[in-house]
Amino acid sequence: FLEAAERAEQAIEEMPDDPNSHYFHAFNLGRYSQSISIVKALKQGIGGKVQKSLSRTLDLLPEHADAHTAMGMYHAEIIDKIGKLVGGMTYGADVKQAMEHFRKALEFAPHSPIVKIEYANGLYLLYGDKRWDDVSELNVEASEAKALDAMERLDIESARSELE
């Protein structure tokens, strides 16, 4: 993931106004941060870099559904890992912003299985069992989606496995 993030940084230098250069920078840093400890990720400043790249993506292309999904997960994961107070003060993580980004992602990509899966994951991180019915409903919707490509097929199968 770090190599891919570095390639995205090169793409940002060459194409600073390309939203996907910024999105894939955030995406790969985010995936990398999920593979290391929260302490290590915080020390490396990954949270701020992810937020900056996602914000730039959305500045360039406000209807970028995947960036809205990722921004929603950014807020949800920060809150889940370090709490609302510290996450909010340090990284600007906010439940309302997370929910707004998930809502926009669904608005821009209403049939996308990954948007529904990540929204479900975000709801669970933010609310736990209190929103279990909503989490389940989103996974059911994702599992019943029609795949447009191989990646969506894998997403649908993932949603189905969550329901078993």
What are these regions (language model features)?
Residues N139-E164:
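A cross-kingdom marker for long, charged
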Residues F1-D17, F27-E63, M73-F108, Y124-E137, ...:
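Short coil/linker segments at helix-helix boundaries
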